[in-house]
Amino acid sequence: MTRRLRRKNIIGGRVAEARKAFNPPLTQDALSGRLARLGIQLDRAAIAKIENNSRHVLDYELKAFSDALGVGVNWLLGDEKK
């Protein structure tokens, strides 16, 4: 079941892709700081788990990732181009 879930969960990969698209790339710690300024407490380890698809993303976290990374929620969900 985990293997099946991983194929369907694209948010983690999109978070990593958006984070690395910054110049210079955002570190997971820097992203954690951006999220904290938005009121979301996720440390580097939690972000790593999300990017590795071993932790689910809650709806309010999805919105915060969108704001912190400057990408649309739909893009994070795989529905549109960056």
Show which residues each predicted segment covers.
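Short alpha-helical elements of helix-turn-helix
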Residues: 13, 29, 45, 59-62
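A short, Lys/Arg-rich alpha-helix, primarily the initiator
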Residues: 1-26, 30, 74
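Short alpha-helical DNA-recognition segment
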Residues: 24-50
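DNA major-groove recognition helix of helix-turn-helix
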Residues: 35, 51, 61, 77-80
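Short, basic-rich loop-to-helix N-cap that marks the start of a DNA-contacting helix
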Residues: 52-67
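Residue-level recognition of specific faces of alpha-helices
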Residues: 46-49, 56, 75
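Short amphipathic recognition helices of helix-turn-helix/homeodomain-type DNA-binding modules
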Residues: 3, 63-69, 73-82
